[in-house]
Amino acid sequence: MDQTMTQASDKEASVADKLQYMPGFGNDFETETLPGALPQGQNSPQKCNYGLYAEQLSGSPFTAPRGTNERSWLYRIRPSVRHTRRFSNASYPHWKSAPCLDDHSLPLGQLRWGPMPVPDEKLSFLDGVRTMTTAGDVLTQTGMAAHVYVFNEDMVDDYAFNADGELLIVPQVGAIRVFTEMGIMDVEPLEIVLIPRGMMFKVLRKGDEKVWRGYICENYGAKFTLPDRGPIGANCLANPRDFKTPVAAYEDKEAPCRVHVKWCGKFYVTEIGHSPLDVVAWHGNYAPFKYDLRTFSPVGAILFDHPDPSIFTVLTAPTESAGTANVDFVIFPPRWLVAEHTFRPPWYHRNIMSEFMGLIHGQYDAKEEGFVPGGISLHNMMLPHGPDASGFEKASNSELKPVKLDHTMAFMFETRYPQQVTKYAAELETLQDNYLECWDGLERRFDGTPGIK
């Protein structure tokens, strides 16, 4: 399969309108843009076809167990040692890393923000990242950071890789084209894309929006994988065949370019004379992918009670403690509500985990007002949360007939570590000072006498 990034610098590069992908999660893929570019029967021949260089990209230690051992072999125009020169310091002041204990006056509490404002200035994807929370420690490769992004300009001659973690990108407004070393992916709202740790990429705009906006989970820990299904069995939730990895593509461009690097929480930049996206063929299991959230097959209660939200886990990044995630990516998709004699929305809750929520589309069933597409809520560990007063009244008194919860897609980045709010988030103009008032109408009903009140 052949997709070649050309030297075109506009946002619609001259590649096939319909990009090609390989289905599967964690597969050992192989793909080449030119016939015979991929060596057969070995990884590192004395001389590669087409004058290419062989290079391995490792996503795990060499001695990791086979089931978690990840690496890919890349056959490229230049080796990666030519894609960096002497580094100089770079500044992205709004992109923070854990631990980030910013000095601000915002006290502890349940928090909610409206959508990110539209920028007045020109911003690329890298320029437009704004960190809302951090958790854990980037130096020990534990925890995560939750970001929002808003941009209106392409990365043309700018490229980046993140040595601190993998990037899970969740578009909310505007489709994006993600060029990586290993291929091209077009990603629209209601899809996600994952860029592995250390992989070179750039992000371009698709379509004619005024602004491109979304969310990012920067996972410092073990990489995202599919959760175990347990008694659910072999099917449902996120099925492996619905994950799409791009076929090989390369950009043969000789022009001044900049490579931006995030390493141990700091940023650096280096200048080179060519595109680093020059992989002509590759094989392996360390690769980017995209996933359409609309293909998630939810399970739920079909008689009574509301199940735990863990049944909506798309991806999980585990820790050494079984069942305790460094970070989970959870969605709340369209689904049927059929439980009898049951309060159907999510129940009131205090949790050891810390929950960062966003809304891609529609309305969230536990919050009918205030939580809007592009917005954010943060419920840190052991802080109570649950349906607002109007949602409680509606769910407590509605007829319990089958109802389809439709035209909605909320998500959650949930971590075992407390999420520290950044100074930027604490002072953001869209912070809703009246959020706690959504529970003010939940009055005492108990009077000591038996009966349903």
Curated annotation (Swiss-Prot):
Residues annotated to bind homogentisate: Y364, H385
Cofactor: Fe cation
Enzyme class at the top of the EC tree: oxidoreductase
Transmembrane segments: none
Any single Gene Ontology cellular-component annotation: cytoplasm
Job of this protein: Involved in the catabolism of homogentisate (2,5-dihydroxyphenylacetate or 2,5-OH-PhAc), a central intermediate in the degradation of phenylalanine and tyrosine. Catalyzes the oxidative ring cleavage of the aromatic ring of homogentisate to yield maleylacetoacetate.
Signal peptide: none
Name of this protein: Homogentisate 1,2-dioxygenase
Keyword flag Iron: yes
Any GO MF annotation of the entry: iron ion binding
UniProt entry keywords in alphabetical sequence: Dioxygenase, Iron, Metal-binding, Oxidoreductase, Phenylalanine catabolism, Tyrosine catabolism
Subunit structure: Hexamer; dimer of trimers.
EC number: 1.13.11.5
Family listed: Belongs to the homogentisate dioxygenase family.
Pathway note: Amino-acid degradation; L-phenylalanine degradation; acetoacetate and fumarate from L-phenylalanine: step 4/6
Listed GO biological process terms: L-phenylalanine catabolic process; tyrosine catabolic process
